[in-house]
A protein has these predicted regions:
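Secondary-structure end/capping motifs
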Residues: 1-66
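Conserved C-terminal helix/tail region of periplasmic/extracytoplasmic solute-binding proteins
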Residues: 42-130
Length: 130
């Protein structure tokens, strides 16, 4: 509950601190099931040695997130719907407008801590950098 309200306890016994935008639920397609995010999660599992990289495994991971169901559920509402189902993860440096099938959508910076971007079409190259 505190995370959703942007009030985070940083240390035991301290009062929660207000951290604006610690977690947002809808803006910038935060809850959209990007296939590229499923692919990135799979890549992290491979990097950590939790799974062995395989074509069928990678394909299965990408089928887990269902943007088709999300779009069907929100069709005709005010919810902006991205036109793409995958994107370059960690590649947005500044607020950028993205193509939609419904509404207007701005995506904010999403850089990863290590500065690397993840292209779901370049899994082998990404893993080779690990």
């Amino acid at each position: 509950e505190r995370a959703i309200s942007d009030r985070i306890t940083l240390a035991a016994g301290q009062e929660p601190v207000h951290i604006p935008d610690f977690m947002f639920q809808h803006r910038e397609a935060a809850n959209f099931p990007w296939v590229s995010q499923a692919a990135w999660l799979y890549a992290q599992m491979v990097r950590a040695g939790h799974v062995v990289k395989s074509g069928p495994g990678y394909a299965a991971a990408q089928r887990v997130f269902r943007p088709d169901i999300y779009r069907a559920a929100f069709a005709g509402t005010q919810v902006p719907l991205p036109g793409a189902s995958a994107k370059l993860e960690g590649g947005i440096n500044e607020t950028t407008g993205v193509g939609t099938v419904q509404g207007r959508l701005l995506m904010g910076p999403d850089r990863f801590f290590d500065g690397r971007a993840f292209d779901p079409d370049q899994l082998d190259a990404y893993l080779a950098q690990s």
